[in-house]
Amino acid sequence: VAMTVQNFEDMGIKTNLNISQFQINENLERSLEKVGPYESVSFSGHNVSFVMLMMKRAMDIAGGLVGMLITAIAVIIVGPLVKLESPGPLFFSQKRVGKNGRIFKIYKIRSMYQDAEERKKELMAQNEMDGLMFKMKDDPRITKVGKFIRKTSIDELPQFWNVLKGDMSLVGTRPPTVDEFEQYSAYHKKRLCQKPGLTGVWQVSGRSTITDFEEIVQMDVDYIDHWSIWRDIGILFKTVWLVVCGDDGAQ
C-alpha cells in the first residue's frame, strides 16, 4: 500500500483508501492521527480536542484547590464527632477502578463503623439496586454522624485530593469498586474511557429514584458521547444546588 500511495504521489494523483470493507460503525467519528511512528485512522464515538481537555484539567485543578480548603475546614469541625461516635481512623480509603481500568485509592471521611466492608456480604440480599451496585436506604453500617455527612456530601470532600492527583475529575462517571468492575460486560466498561468524577449525571438526576444499573450506564454513556465543558459546568452548578438545598438520595 505504501508503495502504491508513493507512486500516485509521484504522479500528482490523490489517493483514497477504502476502509468500508472493515464494516466499522458509521456513527463513529474518524480522524487521522500519528501514534508513535505510525500514521493511523482513529475511530471514536466522540472526539474531544486537546484544548477542551486542557480546559477540563484546568477546571479540575482550580476546583480541587478550593475543595481542599473546604475539606480542611470540614475536617476540623466534623472530625472529632466522627472519632467520638466510632473510634478508628478519620479517613476511609478504598480501591476503585478509574480511567482505562487503572486502580486507584479513593478517599472519604469515614461515615460507617470500621467493620462495614465485612458486613457488606451479609447485607447483599437487601441490596436495593438492580445490577452491579450496592445501596440500602437504612444501611445499619452507617453511624449517626455518618448519616449527616452523607446527606450533606461532606464525606466526599477528601476526593478533591483525588481530583488534584489526576485520579478523578470534578465531573465524570461513578468509579466502580474492583468487585463491581470484575462483573462488567464490554459495554459497561465504556464508563471508564474517561476519568471518573466527584459528581456526574446520575448524582444530579434523582439518584434516590434510579435503581436500575443499566439505566445509570446509559446515562453515563450519553454523557461521554455528548461531553462538553459547558455540560460539566451545568452539572457542577446543579450539584452545588442539591448540596445546599439537600439531597435525600445521598446514602
Question: Over which residues does each language-model region extend?
Answer:
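N-terminal hydrophobic signal-anchor/signal peptide
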Residues: V1-A72, A250-Q251
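Short, glycine-rich, amphipathic interfacial segments at transmembrane boundaries or analogous
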Residues: E29-L32, F92-P140, T199-D220
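Residue-level signature of catalytic and energy-coupling elements of molecular machines
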Residues: T15, I73, G101, F160, ...
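A hydrophobic, helix-centered structural microdomain
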Residues: S49-R119, G234-Q251
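Short, well-ordered beta-strand elements within core beta-sheets of diverse protein domains
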Residues: G67, K144-T152, V221-D225
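C-terminal terminal-structure detector
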Residues: N47, K137, A186-Q251
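A short, structured surface patch at a secondary-structure boundary
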Residues: L132-Q194, I235-V243
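An acidic site on a long C-lobe helix of protein kinase domains
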Residues: M54-R57, K105, R141, S153-E156, ...
